[in-house]
Amino acid sequence: MNRRFLLKAALGSLAGSGLGLRWAQSARAWSYIGSDGPDHWGELSPDYAACATGRHQSPIDLGRVEPVPMDSLQFDYRPTPLTLVNTGHTVRIDYASGSRLILERQPFELLQFHFHDPSEHTRSGQHQPMEIHFVHRNAPTQALVVLSVLVRAGQENPTLQKMWPYLPSQINQPSTVMREWVNARDLLPDTATSVFRYSGSLTTPPCSETVTWLVLGEPVTASLAQISQFYRLIGENARPTQSRPT
């Protein structure tokens, strides 16, 4: 698998495209290791300058943020046909329109969710084996909300088990499995009562500081076999935590 595939989060050009937050080809490759890894993203392109100079970068250690109750947060997620894309940097599940998160009475449509191994956010410096990012956008303002769920090793996750047989090895070739439907709600913890909320950035180039982060206070589980299957396909794809004011 070509982990140096030419990809970029072209957020600005997609704002009015109706495609949601997608990955597009770029003039410069980036990766998670070596000379085009996270320590060098800001050097790869002027478009990536925020990766080096931004003051509100993500991810962070959650010990720097006070958890707040989830009173202002509601989920209206509906089942969607399973559509998977291997971007070369993660596996993305594209979501059909009609599902949303409501934050302080404002609706944010769920565009997609994707995975990181290990987790990008930490607690007391400790990673979990995986993290799931649910990317939402408010249509009138184009504001982004990313809901994050940490994944610890434990019992097999039945929702992941529906998806994992179809993890694609070909890059940028969307695959829809019409006989399998998934509901993002099934990947959220049943017991979460608090959330870590802060203003931050995309965790991949161009590292735009346009994101409200909501990291749920309780994790979900996945089996070691499920975690290993994702790792064998993608490898490590987590940006280190960032030093920044909160």
Regions found by a protein language model. Give the residues of each.
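Alpha-carbonic anhydrase
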Residues: N2-T246
